[in-house]
Amino acid sequence: MHSSPRPPSLSHPRAGQCIFRKVAPKITHRHAESNNPYMKEAYDDAKEHSYISYLDANNLYGQAMVQPLPITNFEWSEERDVNTLIETFADNETNGCIVKCDLEYPAELHDSHNDYPLAPERKLVTQDMLSPYAANLQHQLGINKDVCEKLVPNLQDKEGYVVDIRNLKFYRDHGLIVKKVHAVITFKQSRWMKSYIDFNTEKRKQAKNDFEKDFFKLMSNSCFGKTMENLRNRVDISFVTSNRTWGKNATKNDRMIERKLASPLYDGHIIYNEDLAAIKQKKKDLLLNQPIYAGMCILDLSKLHMYRFHYDVIKKTYQDKAKLLFTDTDSLCYYY
């Protein structure tokens, strides 16, 4: 922020805090075998050539952080026409918006999008969602059957989906249907992180050892991490000792421990031994001053980069000949 030409605003609509919310790792095919001359003795020239390629997006978050990102002038918009929003903001260098909308995933896209569905969302994963294979694996490994929330790429319709307008344009152009727009936040945006990220990227190129490369990579990624920090997860930890006397005979230290344990902010404790424990308390006051709106857009732009490569490069070049085996946040593995 200090190296930016204009620091971002750290105040925005209170309700907007809740509208802002990674690419989910996913295994699509569990088994594939390549067959080509590079396999040496394993190569079978009687069979058709096939390859497995693992492709990594170098500096994925860095490329997103040099894009135009929200900076100030956050306002609720009354505009609800998605075409107008896309025409106004999707390719706008100085103005942007985030949209909360309902999306329909047409059935005719399911086969072609099954390996890398657009618009992943956080969902409560229940037992009825598991395939027979997954359910059997859960039983064999003794995995807890409690309902849990996960980031899930899926082909279902979305309700109340929050998305950057640039991603929404890509989703629409690739067949998803915007059924309804619920809310829109507009803002001024600029490439306010570009000079800092470019500096780190250039220093990383010039690095002469692994420490320097990792250091300047960390300088960029940790900056992104702070934009996504959930300040509500911060806690106070007190290390305490006790003479184990209570009531009227309690010492000042013991009464302090009693107050912490009885406090509505109490959030658990760890006992290390008979004489030492740690008491965890939630923060009494929180100052929500992290630019989470920037973090949300960085995540969306990172997804967009991966989606563009898959759908607009690999799919267009190889069509059905390229099969996506698995993905990670910044990588794709193909069999073709």
Give residue spans per PLM region:
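Conserved acidic
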Residues: 1-336
